[in-house]
Amino acid sequence: MDVTEIAEQTLNTSCLSPACQQQDYAEIEKRYEAERHQQLQTRGKIPDVNIRTNTRFEQFSKDPWLDDSNKRQQIQYHQRRHNGKHHKVLIIGAGYGGLLFAVRIIQTGAFTADDILMVDTSGGFGGTWYWNRYPGLMCDVESYIYMPLLEETGYMPRAKYASGPELRVHAERIADTWKLSNRAMFGVTVKSLDWDEVGKHWSARGLVLDYEKDQSKKASLHLSADFVMLASGIFASPKIPDFTSILEYHGHMFHTSRWDYGCTGGSPENPKLCKLGDKKVGIIGTGATAIQVVPHLAQYSKELHVFQRTPSAVDKRDNHPTDPVWWNKMLQSEGPGWQKRRMENFNAFTGNEQPQPAVDMIADGWTSMPSFSIIGGSPESNATDYLHRMKAFDFPRQERIRARVRETVHNKEVAEALSPWYPGWCKRPCFHDHYLAAFNRPNVRLIDVRQSGIDHFTPKGLVADGREHEIDVFVFSTGYTTSRSSPGGRADIAITGRNGLTMEHKWQNGLATLHGVITRDFPNLFFPGPSQAGTCLNHTYTLDQLATHVAYIISKTLIKIGAADAGYSPRVVIEPTKEAEEDWAVQVLARAATHGALSQCTPGYYNRDGMASAMKSLSMEDKMKLGRMVSWGEGIGSYMDQIVNWRGQGELRGLEIHCVD
């Protein structure tokens, strides 16, 4: 079924003629533009609180989950064991991305687990699934394709969309399976990476937390490594907007990624928030996290005040337990390679690849939304009518979402405030079966701040919508810091390559990479995009394919110099030629136009809080610089074709390789 057929099925049956539909579309477009214009006029970019230096918020940068003294002692043992040593491979980040880097290079046979050191600021494996333990947490992409290495570990997820605790335990399962549990150094903050041109290695410096001293005492970190892989994730640290007089508030505050069960009651495994029965709770933010949190807060709080700037588009979820009989039949019928094929089936539908597969294996809200390919790209993205075709699909879909709000929420004013008036690709689509219904509860109040914003905090709460709201507990569902552009910047690591060149400078002044994973003058340093690499909705697929690509580059290089066996690896220096990375940057630029549709969106993190709307006023030089920072514009399938064909040539074309000894 093509996009037109899907769109026709969701059209308002009271308006079926083409002329009527065009009139409806024109009216909707006017409403979208009015909403965007209003938010651009009233929505200033609020600076973020520096949670590392502000004493009121410093607890947000600490690890609240290490209450096991044995675990703390084990972490400190590995800190002492690994600090000050040289390692063949240093992986910064111990979430799914870091684990995939480790597993894929081990699978090449060129390295063992003992050659690898993983470091992370947290106290365990999991990345975002380590830090986030809020009530209602689950993945919003099908767990059978989101949870990596299911085929290799033999694990069957409990439900179509797995819970947070299950996702965290799976990270630990991967570490145990590949003997990585003893190759991790937790409580580590890498502050700088410097290339040693004489020694041909990377030097990492930073801080190591002392968990026995309430995470207040920090020792110096010094490591060196032949290869470094950055896998610290897309979102570096919790974002707390620096609202006016926020420090004057006397009540309790916490961020969703540092959920305080001591305040709310319950636990990640049993989130009964029994301590909120006499509390007025305020949650700020209504993005993908809040969609999962609000139903739980609504159930247990005396009062829940939801402060909303832009409503999310919330479709149905329809989660259900995994049927073991179906699972075993699926494994038997699909055979080896089933997970990768299932992932790519999902990519084909969400990336609007043509022709589409005969069977939609996932069959959920994502795969029936080809218009979201505006974000990740599609092979047809550069077609002159592509945006028009995606709008033709998206208009009726968004109207169906708004109709769902009207049907579910009893109060008409609240329903209108919860209705999304923007294209479906402007804000991450959400899927939940209980969020909208929560606003029918008598203890839940929606405060719409899209026009006036949050004015200021007071000792008892905050002022918004012209009056003071007294709140006992504030929950910040305000996302993560995303302001910096380079892989080092997002991880808050100062990276300096050859001849004193910083990564931030290169990203801001003519970024060029080879395939979005390596850049000249930063030898042996690898990163998983997203600039100049392919991206897709299922982020673990992207991470896995980039990890596989990096593993190929390193192992093929070692084969080329005659050192392919683990245990014998003379030092080698790998980086792209200037010509190769410039050629790749030009190819990225040629496909960058697809991202221009974001300028028509309400402000959000997809368009850097509306900055895309200011593109017209930039010089051509600045536009070209920004164009180099985007992801591959034709979608993940096209990107994979590029790198698979490159590997198929077997020449490591575009790479400069030097053997050190």
Curated annotation (Swiss-Prot):
Keywords: FAD, Flavoprotein, Glycoprotein, Membrane, Monooxygenase, NADP, Oxidoreductase, Transmembrane, Transmembrane helix. GO terms for cellular component: membrane. Its cofactor is FAD. Disruption phenotype: Completely abolishes the production of novofumigatonin, but accumulates asnovolin J. The chain crosses the membrane at residues 89-111. GO terms for molecular function: monooxygenase activity; oxidoreductase activity. Pathway: Secondary metabolite biosynthesis; terpenoid biosynthesis. Glycans are attached at residues 12, 382, 538. InterPro entries: FAD-binding_Monooxygenases, FAD/NAD-bd_sf. Its EC number is 1.14.-.-. It is a single-pass membrane protein. The keyword Nucleotide-binding does not apply. The record marks 428 as: Transition state stabilizer. The keyword Flavoprotein applies. FAD binds at residues 128-131, 140-141, 146. NADP(+) binds at residues 138-140, 286-292, 309-310. One of its GO terms (biological process) is novofumigatonin biosynthetic process. It catalyses: chermesin D + AH2 + O2 = asnovolin I + A + H2O; asnovolin J + AH2 + O2 = asnovolin A + A + H2O. SUPFAM superfamilies: FAD/NAD(P)-binding domain (SSF51905). It is found in: Membrane. Belongs to the FAD-binding monooxygenase family. Chermesin D/asnovolin J monooxidase; part of the gene cluster that mediates the biosynthesis of novofumigatonin, a heavily oxygenated meroterpenoid containing a unique orthoester moiety. The first step of the pathway is the synthesis of 3,5-dimethylorsellinic acid (DMOA) by the polyketide synthase nvfA via condensation of one acetyl-CoA starter unit with 3 malonyl-CoA units and 2 methylations. DMOA is then converted to farnesyl-DMOA by the farnesyltransferase nvfB. This is Chermesin D/asnovolin J monooxidase nvfH.
